[in-house]
A protein has these predicted regions:
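Conserved PDZ fold ligand-binding element
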Residues: 239-261, 281
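Small-residue-rich helix-interface/hinge motifs
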Residues: 10-121, 126-131, 137-146, 151-178, ...
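Terminal peptide-recognition signature
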Residues: 29-32, 69, 239, 246-249, ...
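Lipid-exposed faces of alpha-helical membrane segments in multi-pass integral membrane proteins
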Residues: 16, 20, 201, 205, ...
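Functional transmembrane alpha-helices
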Residues: 2-7, 181-193, 233-236, 242, ...
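PDZ-domain C-terminal substructure recognizer with occasional recognition of PDZ-binding tails
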Residues: 266-328
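Internal alpha-helical transmembrane segments
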Residues: 28, 39, 76, 80, ...
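Juxtamembrane boundary at the C-terminal end of a transmembrane helix
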Residues: 464-471
Length: 471
């Protein structure tokens, strides 16, 4: 019973740790948008960590910006003034002389209404700047507004739901309601190049943090490399052309190894009997303290089978060709591989930290390509629940695991948010570039609809891949 309780507490603690990692990554992402916006003169209405009802909120006396900590710790947003762009259309119509008809003047509802771009036409007085600033601090009635906001963060490959509540304007104190008049430009009225910088700033901050964590991890613990736990003995191939127990794989065919897919890429297309060049770290003795004495060496390994890799998950043929032992456990089996920490020199460690981040980013594009071409099924992916599950398992093992998975998630979040998928920062960049080239924006309502539909599809996809993982 005691062990059961300890295991339960350990599991809960690991899950909480995983959620905290995601929350930190999302907060850093939104802070990137925030700091870029401040430096470039944008007016910001709210910076929120989490979604749903506010647990804590405070309005800055100096800037009038609302800072909030909300109940659901699976997202966040940085709300820029005028980012829905409806004011632009209103101003344009007024300049063209469309006055007197409230249906043509394009007055916008308070942002407390869901999807203001779908508002019913009706005569309303145009809100003042102070009213607009106050309204911008009220969360949406059902979270739909936050769903298509530019600054919503999504954890790779998951999409976070936006849980809103009733308007909280009444919950603010009179002191908080008396916000000063803010300075700065509305989002859609700022220069396109400034908007692009703000849009990519979140991903940039995620990447910077991820590389920093990887550098700390690699210098403190070494890089995690693929090691042979047990090699399959054979009398058909001389021992000098075989891998041995506890060999650590460093390079294959002159290419440095970072991920298991790197081994597959280096050996793909080779036939049984081919000799491949590899650099390994091999045990050559034992130190006085009982640890292994290792030596780096270049060896030629004879492949025992053809290597024909179909996708990123198809690695069985690679391990079979290298002579890795395979042991059956019940109805399944396990290749006798292990992870080993390996320390490199100062400059190589620094270079490998950046190279590893590039490899992670490249693997994302590779997997997406395999999905689009049908070479990989969506069952190989995971949604938010899978992300939390895997993160909790790795981060809960050690501080080293915490650093590695945090760095991995940071790169994933950066790359995923820059993909040109509606509702993500990347698609906003695409729309802004098109506007820059055309010298005028696309229809703001159409753009908002595209992002809203994109969000719903992303959410549905995330739920689907999670279901496939747990069914």
């Amino acid at each position: 019973m005691e062990n059961l309780l300890l295991n339960a507490w350990s599991t809960v603690g690991s899950v909480v740790l995983a959620i905290l990692i995601l929350l930190v990554m999302i907060t850093i992402h939104e802070f990137g948008h925030y700091i870029a916006g401040k430096l470039l003169g944008f007016r910001i209405d709210e910076f929120s960590i989490g979604f749903g009802p506010a647990l804590f909120k405070r309005r800055s006396k100096k800037t009038g910006e609302l800072f909030a900590l909300r109940l659901i710790p699976l997202g966040g947003y940085c709300a820029f003034a005028g980012e829905d762009g409806l004011d632009d259309e209103t101003d344009t119509k007024q300049e063209e002389g469309e006055e007197g008809d409230p249906k043509k003047n394009g007055e916008k509802l308070s942002v407390s209404e869901p999807f203001p771009q779908f508002q019913e036409d009706g005569a309303q007085p145009k809100p003042s700047d102070a009213d607009r600033a106050s309204a911008a601090n009220v969360p949406s009635a059902d979270g739909a507004l936050e769903a298509h906001k530019r600054d919503e963060s999504v954890a790779q490959p998951s999409v976070q739901t936006c849980v809103g509540g009733a308007s909280e304007e009444g919950n603010l104190s009179e002191k908080d309601k008396e916000a000063p008049v803010r300075t700065g430009g509305e989002f859609t009225k700022m220069a396109p190049w400034k908007r692009i910088i703000v849009l990519i700033a979140g991903a940039f901050m995620n990447y910077v943090l991820a590389v920093f964590l990887l550098i700390v991890c690699f210098f403190a613990y070494g890089q995690t490399m693929i090691a042979v736990y047990k090699a399959e003995p054979t009398a058909e191939i001389p021992a000098q052309y075989c891998l041995q127990d506890y060999d650590i794989l460093l390079e294959a065919q002159g290419k440095k190894l970072y991920l298991t897919t790197d081994v597959a890429q280096a050996l793909n297309g080779h036939k049984a009997g081919d000799l491949v060049e590899m650099r390994i770290s091999r045990v050559v003795g034992t130190k006085e303290d009982g640890t292994y004495l290792r030596e780096e060496m270049d060896v030629r390994i004879a492949l025992r089978a053809d290597v024909d890799v179909r996708n990123s998950a198809d690695l069985d043929g690679v391990w079979r060709a290298l002579g890795i032992a395979y042991e059956t456990e019940g109805e399944s089996g396990v290749w006798q591989l292990a992870n080993a920490s390996y320390r490199f020199g100062f400059w190589e460690t620094l270079g490998r930290s950046f190279a590893y981040s590039f490899k992670i980013a490249g693997s994302i594009f590779k997997v997406l390509g395999e999905l689009l071409t049908g070479r990989l099924g969506i069952s190989a992916l995971g949604g938010p629940l899978t992300t939390i599950s895997v993160t909790s398992q790795i981060a809960g093992r050690s501080f080293r695991g915490f650093l590695e998975i945090a760095g991995f998630l940071g790169v994933n979040l950066a790359v995923f948010n820059l993909l040109p998928i509606p509702a993500l920062d990347g698609s906003k960049v695409v729309f802004t570039v098109i506007e820059w080239i055309r010298k005028k924006p696309l229809n703001r309502k159409v753009e908002a609809i595209i992002h809203a539909v994109g969000f719903v599809l992303l959410l549905g996809f995330a739920v689907l891949v999670d279901i496939l993982q747990f069914v």
